[in-house]
C-alpha cells in the first residue's frame, strides 16, 4: 500500500503594483517634500517581485517559500494599518480555483488587505500539499510535516477569515480542506507503520491509527456526500469516491489489526468477530475500488482477511473453544491521532523575523498611534533604568574622588615609600598627622578664597533684598494684586530654601570661624600633637620590618590602580549602555504583540529590558568591588601605620590621637557642608536679584503708566483750549505686569532667566511689563468723544518732519526725517497739515492757571522723588515745559 493525496489547485490573480500604492500613500500622508524620507524604492520592487514569484510557475518547494515570505510582508503591513489598506488605493483581484467543469473561473476584486492575506494563505496550503505529494515516496517524514502544515493553514483560514466572496475561502470549504489534509497526513503515518515490516507486532497501535483515519475521512465524506444526482459542495465529483473508499477501507484495516491484537491477547472469539467485521467493511469499500486501485490492493487484503479468519476459526474449534460474539463495534477501539500540526504563528515566525529589518525600512512611515503610546511607556521604563545606573555610577565616582582627595593617597604612598626605601626618618613620624594638616590647609585656602565665607553677612544681604522687594510691592496699586501675590509667594518659597541652605552651616559656626582664623586653628590642632622630644630616635628603631612595610605599600599602590581601572571600566560600560538604549527600538515587537493586554505588555517590557542586564550588572559589580577595595586600602594603611611602630603609644598619646581625630572629623564635616553652601548660595542670590528686578520693573511700569495718563489729560486740554490737535500714536498697553507669569515660568530657585538685550514685541491680546528704557516712544491715545469733530475720531496721519517749513520747525525735537501715515483714511481740513506746537499764551481764566500750577507742583514733586524722570519723559506733547522754561 501507498498513500495518495487529492490534488488541489491554486487561485490565480492579477498583478498588484505595491510600489505605486506605497508611494502614493506616503505622498498623501507626508507631502511631496518629505515622503521620500520614508520611501525605499528597492524594497518596494522586492516586495512586488516576491508576490509575482508566489503566484508564478515555480516548483512547489519554491512556491511554499515565496508564499510564506509574501504573507509575512502582508502581516507586517497589517500590524501597522489593520483594515485601513484602502488608503493605498490598491485593488486585489483573485480568481476561484478551477475545479470540475467550470469554463471560466469567477473573478473577485476587493481593496482589503484581509482578502489578499486569505487568498495568499489558501495558495500556501495548496502548495504545501503539492510538496507533500512529491515527497511521499522519497521522504515520508517531510511529506507528513508539510501535510500537517497545510492542515493548519486551512484551519487558520477557516477560523479567522469570514464572509469571503470567493468559494475557495468560505468557512465550510476551508474547514473541509483542513480535515482532508489532516486525514491524508494520518494516512501517511498509518501506511508507513504498516509497511515497515513489523505491523503484526504493532497491531494494537495500527488499529488505533486506522480507526482515527477512518473517522477523519468520515468527516470529509459527510461534507461531500449529496443526494443522487446532486452537485458536490466543493471541489470535484471524484473526491467523494476517494474519500468514501478510504473511509471504509481504513475501517476494515482497523478491524483486522484489532483482531490480530486480540489474538495476541488470547481473545480468539472476539478476534474472529472483528475479522468478520473487517470483511464487511472491505466489501463496503469495493464500489470505490476504481478510484483507489492504484494505491490499495483490495483483492490482496481481502485474501489476507479470509485466510486469517479460516485459521482462527479452525484453531478455536479444535483448541480454544472461545465463544464468538454475535456483533462487535469499532467504537471499542481507542482512536489515536498521530498528527500534531505546528501552530500558524510558529510557522510564520521565522519568516517574520527574516524580513523584520526590511519591513522596518519599508514601512517606517506607517506606525499606528497605539504603538507610539506603548513605546513611550517602554521608553520611560528604559530611561528610569538608565537614570538609576547614571546616578549609581556618579555616586561611585564621587566616592572615589572624595576618598582620593581626602586621603591624598598618591602623595601619601609616594612619601611613605620614599622614606622607607631611603631609611630617611629625619622628618615627621606621624604620616596621619601630615595628611590631616594637608587636608586642613586645602580647606582653609578654599574658604579664604570664597566670596561667601561669612554666612551671617550673606543672610543680612538676603534680608535686605527681601525688604527692598517688599517695600516696592507695598507701593503698587491694587490693580497689581495678582502679580504682588505671585512675587510674595516666590519670596516664601525662597525663604524655605534659604532655611534649608543655611541650616547646613549654622551648626558648624565655631568650626568655620576656626577655618577663617588659621592661627587659632593650628594652635588647637597642635595641642593634640605628640611630643617627640622624649621618644626614642627612629634611627635606633629596628628596621627589620621595612621590607614588610614596603610590600604592603606596593599592595596599596596596586589597589589604588585597581580603583582607577574600576572607575574607567564603569565609565566605558555606562557609555555603552547609553548607546545601546539610544539605539534600542522595539517597534516591531510591539506591532507583533499589538493585541497584548497590559499584563502581557509588562512581561514584554521586562524581557526587553533584560537585554541591558549584562551592562547594568557590570556597573553594579564595579561599584561593589570599589567599596571592597576602598575598605581594604583603609585596613592596609592602618597596618602600615601599626608596623611603623606608631601604635606603641602611651595612653596619653592615644587619647591625644583620638581627640585629634575627632577634631579633624568636625573640621571635615564643617568644610564639606560649607562647600555645598558655597555652591548653592549664588543660585539663591541670583534668584533674589531676579525678583528684585521684576519688582522694580513692575513699579516703574506703573509709574510710567500714570505719567502716560497725565499726558492723555494734557492732550485733551490742548484740544479744548486751542485749535490744533496733536497727532495720536499707537495705544500703550494698559494692564502692566501681566508677563509676570511668563517670567516665573522661566525662573526657579536654581536658575535665573537671562534678561533680554532687546525688548520683544507684545503677543496679541497680551499686556506686557513696560520698560522705562523704551517708554519714550510710547504714548496713549486720547479717548474719542461723541461731542468732538468727526475727524478727531479717525486715525490721523503721523506728522511728516519737514525742516523746510517755517512754522513750528524749531519746536520738534529729534532727527527723524519723515513719518508715514498710520491709516489711509482721508482726513479733511487742518488734519492734512503738520500740527503746530500749542501757542504759549497765558491762561484766560483763573481755573486754567490753578490747574497748570497744580500740574507743575506735582511734576516738581516727581522730579524730587525721581531725579531722572525728566530724561524719561518726552517733551513733544508736554506743553507745560515750554511755559515752565520760558520765564512766564
Curated annotation (Swiss-Prot):
PANTHER family: PCD6 INTERACTING PROTEIN-RELATED (PTHR23030), TYROSINE-PROTEIN PHOSPHATASE NON-RECEPTOR TYPE 23 (PTHR23030:SF30). Residues 735-751, 812-826 have a biased composition (Polar residues). Residues 756-765 have a biased composition (Pro residues). Gene3D superfamilies: alix/aip1 in complex with the ypdl late domain (1.20.120.560), alix/aip1 like domains (1.25.40.280). The keyword Cytoplasm applies. Residues 706-873 are annotated as: Disordered. Its main location: cytoplasm. The lineage of its organism: Eukaryota, Fungi, Dikarya, Ascomycota, Saccharomycotina. The gene is BRO1. Involved in concentration and sorting of cargo proteins of the multivesicular body (MVB) for incorporation into intralumenal vesicles. It comes from the Eukaryota. It is found in: Cytoplasm; Endosome. Keywords: Coiled coil, Cytoplasm, Endosome, Protein transport, Transport. It holds the Pfam family BRO1. This is Vacuolar protein-sorting protein BRO1. GO terms for cellular component: endosome membrane; extracellular vesicle. InterPro entries: ALIX_V_dom (IPR025304), BRO1_dom (IPR004328), BRO1_sf (IPR038499). Residues 854-865 have a biased composition (Basic and acidic residues). Residues 706-723 have a biased composition (Low complexity). GO terms for biological process: ATP export; intralumenal vesicle formation; mitochondria-associated ubiquitin-dependent protein catabolic process; positive regulation of protein deubiquitination; protein deubiquitination; protein localization to endosome; protein transport to vacuole involved in ubiquitin-dependent protein catabolic process via the multivesicular body sorting pathway. Residues 4-400 form the BRO1 domain. Belongs to the BRO1 family. Residues 543-578 form a coiled coil. GO terms for molecular function: deubiquitinase activator activity.
Amino acid at each position: 500500500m501507498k498513500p495518495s493525496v487529492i490534488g488541489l489547485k491554486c487561485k490565480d490573480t492579477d498583478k498588484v503594483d505595491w510600489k505605486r500604492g506605497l508611494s502614493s500613500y506616503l505622498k498623501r500622508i507626508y507631502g511631496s517634500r518629505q515622503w521620500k524620507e520614508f520611501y525605499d524604492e528597492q524594497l518596494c520592487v522586492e516586495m512586488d517581485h516576491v508576490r509575482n514569484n508566489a503566484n508564478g510557475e515555480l516548483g512547489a518547494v519554491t512556491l511554499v517559500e515565496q508564499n510564506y515570505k509574501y504573507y509575512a510582508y502582508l502581516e507586517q503591513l497589517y500590524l501597522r494599518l489593520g483594515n485601513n489598506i484602502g488608503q493605498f488605493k490598491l485593488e486585489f483581484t483573485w480568481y476561484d480555483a478551477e475545479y470540475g467543469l467550470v469554463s471560466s473561473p469567477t473573478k473577485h476584486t476587493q481593496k482589503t488587505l484581509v482578502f489578499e492575506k486569505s487568498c495568499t494563505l489558501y495558495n500556501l496550503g495548496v502548495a504545501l500539499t503539492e510538496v507533500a505529494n512529491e515527497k511521499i515516496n522519497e521522504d515520508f517524514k517531510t511529506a507528513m510535516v508539510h501535510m500537517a502544515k497545510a492542515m493548519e493553514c486551512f484551519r487558520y483560514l477557516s477560523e479567522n477569515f469570514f464572509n469571503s466572496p470567493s468559494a475557495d475561502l468560505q468557512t465550510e470549504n476551508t474547514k473541509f480542506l483542513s480535515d482532508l489534509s489532516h486525514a491524508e497526513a494520518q494516512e501517511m503515518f498509518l501506511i508507513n507503520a504498516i509497511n515497515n515490516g513489523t505491523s503484526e507486532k504493532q497491531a494494537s497501535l495500527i488499529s488505533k491509527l486506522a480507526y482515527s483515519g477512518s473517522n477523519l475521512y468520515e468527516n470529509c465524506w459527510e461534507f461531500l456526500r449529496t443526494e443522487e444526482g446532486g452537485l458536490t459542495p466543493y471541489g470535484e465529483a471524484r473526491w467523494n469516491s476517494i474519500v468514501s473508499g478510504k473511509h471504509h477501507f481504513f475501517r476494515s484495516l482497523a478491524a483486522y489489526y484489532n483482531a490480530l491484537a486480540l489474538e495476541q491477547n488470547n481473545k480468539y472469539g472476539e478476534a474472529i468477530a472483528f475479522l468478520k467485521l473487517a470483511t464487511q467493511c472491505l466489501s463496503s469499500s469495493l464500489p470505490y475500488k476504481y478510484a483507489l486501485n492504484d494505491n490499495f490492493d483490495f483483492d490482496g487484503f481481502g485474501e489476507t482477511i479470509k485466510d486469517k479468519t479460516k485459521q482462527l476459526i479452525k484453531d478455536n474449534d479444535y483448541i480454544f473453544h472461545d465463544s464468538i460474539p454475535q456483533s462487535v463495534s469499532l467504537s471499542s477501539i481507542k482512536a489515536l491521532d498521530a498528527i500534531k500540526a505546528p501552530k500558524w504563528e510558529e510557522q510564520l515566525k521565522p519568516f517574520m523575523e527574516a524580513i523584520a529589518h526590511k519591513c522596518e525600512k519599508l514601512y517606517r512611515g506607517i506606525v499606528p498611534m497605539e504603538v507610539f503610546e506603548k513605546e513611550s511607556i517602554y521608553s520611560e521604563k528604559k530611561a528610569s533604568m538608565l537614570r538609576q545606573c547614571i546616578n549609581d555610577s556618579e555616586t561611585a565616582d564621587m566616592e572615589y574622588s572624595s576618598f582620593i582627595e581626602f586621603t591624598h593617597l598618591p602623595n601619601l604612598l609616594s612619601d611613605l615609600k620614599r622614606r622607607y626605601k631611603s631609611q630617611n626618618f629625619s622628618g615627621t613620624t606621624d604620616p596621619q598627622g601630615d595628611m590631616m594638616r594637608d587636608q586642613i590647609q586645602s580647606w582653609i585656602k578654599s574658604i579664604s578664597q570664597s566670596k561667601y565665607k561669612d554666612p551671617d553677612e550673606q543672610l543680612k544681604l538676603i534680608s535686605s533684598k527681601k525688604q527692598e522687594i517688599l517695600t516696592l510691592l507695598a507701593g503698587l496699586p491694587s490693580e497689581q494684586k495678582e502679580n504682588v501675590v505671585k512675587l510674595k509667594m516666590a519670596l516664601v518659597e525662597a525663604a524655605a530654601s534659604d532655611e534649608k541652605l543655611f541650616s547646613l552651616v549654622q551648626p558648624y559656626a565655631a568650626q568655620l570661624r576656626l577655618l577663617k582664623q588659621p592661627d587659632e586653628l593650628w594652635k588647637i590642632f597642635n595641642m593634640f600633637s605628640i611630643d617627640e622630644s622624649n621618644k626614642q630616635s627612629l634611627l635606633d628603631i629596628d628596621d627589620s620590618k621595612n621590607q614588610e612595610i614596603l610590600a604592603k605599600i606596593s599592595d596599596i599602590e596596586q589597589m589604588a590602580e585597581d580603583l582607577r581601572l574600576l572607575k574607567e571600566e564603569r565609565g566605558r560600560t555606562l557609555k555603552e549602555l547609553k548607546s545601546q538604549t539610544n539605539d534600542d527600538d522595539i517597534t516591531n515587537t510591539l506591532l507583533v504583540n499589538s493585541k497584548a493586554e497590559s499584563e502581557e505588555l509588562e512581561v514584554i517590557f521586562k524581557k526587553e529590558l533584560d537585554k541591558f542586564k549584562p551592562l547594568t550588572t557590570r556597573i553594579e559589580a564595579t561599584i561593589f568591588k570599589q567599596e571592597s577595595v576602598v575598605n581594604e586600602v583603609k585596613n592596609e594603611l592602618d597596618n602600615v601605620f601599626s608596623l611603623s611602630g606608631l601604635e606603641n603609644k602611651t595612653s596619653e598619646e592615644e587619647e591625644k590621637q583620638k581627640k585629634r581625630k575627632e577634631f579633624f572629623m568636625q573640621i571635615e564635616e564643617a568644610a564639606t557642608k560649607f562647600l555645598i553652601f558655597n555652591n548653592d548660595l549664588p543660585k539663591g542670590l541670583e534668584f533674589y536679584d531676579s525678583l528684585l528686578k521684576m519688582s522694580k520693573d513692575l513699579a516703574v511700569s506703573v509709574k510710567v503708566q500714570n505719567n502716560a495718563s497725565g499726558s492723555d489729560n494734557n492732550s485733551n486740554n490742548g484740544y479744548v483750549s486751542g485749535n490744533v490737535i496733536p497727532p495720536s500714536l499707537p495705544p500703550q498697553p494698559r494692564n502692566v505686569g501681566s508677563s509676570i507669569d511668563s517670567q516665573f515660568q522661566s525662573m526657579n530657585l536654581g536658575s535665573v532667566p537671562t534678561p533680554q538685550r532687546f525688548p520683544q514685541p507684545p503677543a496679541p491680546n497680551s499686556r506686557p511689563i513696560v520698560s522705562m528704557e523704551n517708554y519714550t516712544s510710547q504714548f496713549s491715545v486720547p479717548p474719542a468723544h461723541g461731542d468732538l469733530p468727526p475727524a478727531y475720531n479717525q486715525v490721523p496721519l503721523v506728522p511728516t518732519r519737514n525742516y523746510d517749513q517755517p512754522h513750528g520747525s524749531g519746536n520738534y525735537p529729534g532727527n527723524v526725517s519723515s513719518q508715514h501715515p498710520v491709516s489711509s483714511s482721508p482726513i479733511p481740513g487742518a488734519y492734512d497739515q503738520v500740527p503746530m506746537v500749542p501757542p504759549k499764551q497765558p491762561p484766560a481764566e483763573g481755573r486754567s492757571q490753578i490747574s497748570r500750577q497744580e500740574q507743575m507742583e506735582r511734576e516738581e514733586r516727581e522730579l524730587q522723588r525721581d531725579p531722572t524722570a525728566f530724561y524719561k519723559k518726552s517733551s513733544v506733547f508736554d506743553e507745560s515745559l515750554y511755559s515752565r522754561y520760558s520765564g512766564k
